[in-house]
Amino acid sequence: MKKLLAQFCFVLLVISCGNEPKKEKFSYDRVKEEPKEVVDSNTIILNSNDQMLFDKSVLKAKVGEEVNLLLNHTGQIGKEFMGHNFVLLKNGVDVDDFAQAAMLAKESEYIPAGDDTIAYTSMIGGGESDQISFTVDEPGTYVFLCTFPGHYQIMRGEFIVE
């Protein structure tokens, strides 16, 4: 009986080890990729966060084209303590003077009276967004910034119009 069991185990071992696994052939079919949604070349998405940063320091546009700018605040702190906006200044405006005047303009969301701006968004807090459309008619390098008190020195960049 032991011999029979030993022979049976040996045969079972030979059968299980002697067979190579079947090699499967894979074929890959080319699949036409669906076009992804393309954002217009004149649409700019600018993100801001609770660390007082914009995700871009240089923005570009073409002369005379309408620019659609979407400002997102990806943080969680409300606009009373960590508000952000986008303000595009006209050429020749002194950034420091403008920012000092903006700090005193709380009732107008830190946008001082006057005609120093080309465009600006509303002040937004964590999880909020604002979208604006504007056109710049002259080529040049303009300054954009956030006018919430204390932010403009870090949250600023160049808006290049070609």
Report each predicted region and the residues it spans.
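Extracytoplasmic/periplasmic copper-protein system
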Residues: N19-I44, K90-Y110, H151-E162
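C-terminal motif of bacterial Sec signal peptides marking the signal peptidase cleavage site
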Residues: I15-S16
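Beta-strand cores of secreted/periplasmic/IMS beta-sandwich domains, seen most often
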Residues: S57-F81, F86-L88, D130-E138, V143, ...
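Positively charged n-region of N-terminal signal peptides that target proteins for export
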Residues: M1-L4
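Extracellular/periplasmic metallocenter environments
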Residues: E24-R30, N72, A119-E162
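Extracytoplasmic beta-sandwich strand-turn segments characteristic of Greek-key/jelly-roll folds
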Residues: D94-E138
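N-terminal edge beta-strand
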Residues: E37-V67
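Sec-dependent N-terminal signal peptides
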Residues: A6-C9
